[in-house]
UniProtKB/Swiss-Prot annotation:
EC numbers for this chain: 1.5.1.5, 3.5.4.9
Annotated catalysed reactions: (6R)-5,10-methylene-5,6,7,8-tetrahydrofolate + NADP(+) = (6R)-5,10-methenyltetrahydrofolate + NADPH; (6R)-5,10-methenyltetrahydrofolate + H2O = (6R)-10-formyltetrahydrofolate + H(+)
Protein name in UniProt: Bifunctional protein FolD
Entry annotated with the keyword Disulfide bond: no
Assembly mode: Homodimer.
Pathway involvement of the protein, from the record: One-carbon metabolism; tetrahydrofolate interconversion
Keywords: Amino-acid biosynthesis, Histidine biosynthesis, Hydrolase, Methionine biosynthesis, Multifunctional enzyme, NADP, One-carbon metabolism, Oxidoreductase, Purine biosynthesis
Length: 284
């Protein structure tokens, strides 16, 4: 068998069509949402990704503000930029592209973001609200994962889901989201301390690979017909590579390509968070 392709580009276009209508309605009220990005350093992948986010904004009629900083930027200067965006009424919400260079205090930077403007849903307050099941901006990549699975009819209620990777952007928050009553999945979070990863993944109905280790998930680790999301990003010979090996496509029932799977939906739900906040401001 050959797995069904979980095509994020197709679903992204559906979401963008809805967002474009909502942005147009906001503009009729004199409100134009604005998304800002803060990018530190010259990583080609990060620059490409941020460029796509601004292209999305242009397509949808959303203002975009880009703050590109050198790799050796000081903590003080970065914090000044964060404060500037917190106070900028033209900025509905913004993201700090992660990871940051090691000399910068990433947690401190995330804490300084105005939680209401946290377009990535990664501020400690917003993650805390996720734990408490309170309304807050949701982390974009986990939200994209769940919507992609639902869009293609993958059952989550009662499903055994194995997550590989415990990073703050995907692994930790998606476990919280999948155990909400709206998803009702049974979640196992695997990481470098997991003694027998293959034993866990072979029992999974859904596998979310977010380890950042190229091609680490192979066909012998996957149950026949399982759904597999490839969220990991690493580099092999200078090229971007996902966590899922090619042979998984012949055994799984559903596989998201990388790129072209979850990534487009990460961007879609980033913009969605901005539009939702603009709508709330308009209703005040």
């Amino acid at each position: 068998m050959s797995a069904t392709k979980l095509d994020g580009n197709l679903y992204r276009d559906e979401i963008f069509e809805d967002l474009a209508q909502r942005v147009a309605a906001l503009k009729e009220k004199g409100i134009t949402p604005g998304l800002a990005t803060v990018l530190v350093g010259d990583d080609p992948g990060s620059h490409s990704y941020v460029k796509m986010k601004h292209r999305d904004c242009e397509k949808l009629g959303i203002n975009s503000i880009r703050k590109d900083l050198p790799a050796d930027v000081s903590q003080e200067e970065l914090e000044r930029v964060i404060e500037e965006l917190n106070n900028d009424d033209a900025c509905t919400g913004y993201i700090v592209q992660l990871p940051l260079p090691k000399h910068l205090d990433e947690n401190r930077v995330l804490e300084l973001i105005d939680p209401a403007k946290d377009a990535d849903g990664l501020h400690p307050i917003n993650l805390g609200k996720l734990v408490l099941n309170e309304e807050a901006p949701l982390p974009c990549t986990p939200n994209g994962c769940i919507h992609l699975l639902r869009r293609f009819g993958v059952e989550l209620d009662g499903a055994k889901v194995v997550i590989i990777g415990r990073g703050v952007t995907v692994g930790r928050p998606i476990g919280l989201m999948l155990t909400r009553r709206s998803e009702n999945s049974t979640v196992t979070l695997c990481h470098t301390g997991t003694k027998d990863l293959a034993a866990e993944t072979r029992e999974a109905d859904v596998i979310i690979a977010a380890a950042g280790k190229a091609h680490m998930l192979t066909a012998d680790m996957v149950k026949e017909g399982a759904a597999v999301l490839d969220v990991g990003v690493s580099r092999v010979d200078g090229k971007l590579a996902g966590d899922v090996a090619e042979d998984v496509w012949e055994k799984a029932g559903y596989v998201s390509p990388n790129p072209g799977g979850v990534g487009p939906l990460t961007r879609a739900f980033l913009v969605s968070n901005i539009v939702e906040r603009a709508e709330k401001l308009a209703a005040q």
